[in-house]
Amino acid sequence: MNKEEQEDPQQEQISTVQENDPRNLQQLGMLLVSPGLDEDRLSEKMISKIKKSRDIEKNQKLLISRLSQKEEDHSGKPPTITTSPAEKTVPFKSLNHSLKRKRVPPALNFSDIQASSHLHGSKSAPPNITRFPQHKNSLRVRYMGRMAPTNQDYHPSVANSYMTATYPYPYTGLPPVPCYPYSSTPTQTHAYEGYYSPMYPGPLYNNGIIPADYHAKRKKLAGRSPHLEDLTSRKRTFVSKHHNGDPIISKTDEDIECSVTKNSLSEGASLNDDADDDNDKERIIIGEISLYDDVFKFEVRDDKNDYMKACETIWTEWHNLKK
C-alpha cells in the first residue's frame, strides 16, 4: 500500500508538466483559430455557390425583419441592407408574394339576377354515373282478369268426340240400354264350326242429345282472349293429371334472358357508354299467379326481394278487388 501511495504523486507531477508544455498550447491555439477560406484553392463553381448562399441568407433575414414589423404600410422604395461599412449596399427585389390572402373576392349575389338573364336557365352537367341500367320501376304487375271455374270448362265426351276418354263417364245420366236375348249354341259340332257366341252389347249413347248450355259456353269461350285460353288449357291438364295420379309439374314461371337496349337507360347515364357492353344484359323473371279465379301477371328482376315485393302487391290488389 505504501508503494502505491508513493507512485501516485509522481504520476500527477508528470501530467501537470505535459499540460504546461508550450508546444501543446500552440497546437491547441492553431486548431481553435479559423484561418478562413483560401480563394486560390477554390474553383469558380464553388465560389458562385458561396455567393448564392450569402444572398439567400440576406433575403431570409430581410423577410424575417419585415414579418416582425407591425406597420404594414411602408415606403415604396426597396429597403437596403448594410452588412458592413466596407461592403456595398445590395438592393432587394421585392416579390409580390404574400403569406396571407388580402384580396378576397366578394360573394355572388344571385338575388339581383333577373328572369331574362342568361344565367337563369343554366343547370349543372349530368353526373358521370356508371353504365349499368337504371331501373326506376323494376316491378311490373298486371291484372289479367278472371278465369272461368273448372267445372264449366269440361264438356261431355258425347258432344266432343275428339276428346280423350281420360275423364270418368257420368253413369247416372245415361239412358236405359235394351237387353237382347241370349241363346247358347253348340260349339263342338261340324255345322257350327267357327261360330262364336255373340258379345253383350255395349251402352248405346244418343249422339243427338246436347246440353242446353253448350252453345252458350262455346260463344263465351270464343270471346275470350288467347291468354285466358292458355290458362284454361293449363288448368285442364292439371285436373287430368290429378285424376290419373300422374306427377304434376308447375311451369308457370319462365326465366327469360332479355337484353336491355341503350334506350332503356335513364337520362342521367353517361354519354360515353359503349353500346356493345356486356353489362347491358339482365335476367328478368316473367310469371303468373292465380288466386282462385283471378289471374295476375308479373315481371321482376332475378332478385328475391323484388319477387317478394311483387307478391305483396298482387296480394293487396286482390284484396282490393274483393272489396
Swiss-Prot record:
Q: Which UniProt keywords apply?
A: Nucleus, Phosphoprotein
Q: Does the keyword Phosphoprotein apply?
A: yes
- Locations of Acidic residues compositional bias? 1-10
Q: How is it modified after translation?
A: Phosphorylated by FUS3 and KSS1, in a pheromone-stimulated manner.
Instruction: Output the GO biological process annotations, alphabetical, semicolon-separated.
Output: cellular response to pheromone; negative regulation of invasive growth in response to glucose limitation; negative regulation of mating-type specific transcription, DNA-templated; negative regulation of pseudohyphal growth; negative regulation of transcription by RNA polymerase II
Location of region: Disordered: 1-26, 67-87
Q: Write down which residues bear the modification named Phosphoserine.
A: 34, 225, 266, 270
- Compartment(s) where it occurs, according to its Swiss-Prot or TrEMBL record: Nucleus
Stated induction or repression of this protein's expression: By pheromone.
Q: Which domain of life is it from?
A: Eukaryota
Q: Does the keyword DNA repair apply?
A: no
Polar residues bias: start-end ranges: 11-26
Q: Where is this chain primarily localised?
A: nucleus
One GO molecular function term of this record is: transcription corepressor activity
GO CC aspect terms = nucleus; Ste12p-Dig1p-Dig2p complex
Q: Other notes on this protein?
A: Present with 1310 molecules/cell in log phase SD medium.
Physiological role: DIG2 and DIG1 are negative regulators of the filamentation and pheromone induced mating program. DIG1 and DIG2 inhibit the transcriptional activity of STE12 by direct protein-protein interaction. DIG2 binds to the DNA binding domain (DBD) of STE12 and thus inhibits transcription when overexpressed.
Quaternary structure and partners: Forms a complex with DIG1, STE12 and either FUS3 or KSS1. The interaction of FUS3 with STE12 depends on the presence of both DIG1 and DIG2. STE12 is lost from FUS3/DIG1/DIG2 complex after pheromone treatment. DIG1 and DIG2 have also been reported to interact with CLN1 and CLN2.
Protein name per UniProt: Down-regulator of invasive growth 2
What species is given as this protein's source?
A: Saccharomyces cerevisiae (strain ATCC 204508 / S288c) (Baker's yeast)
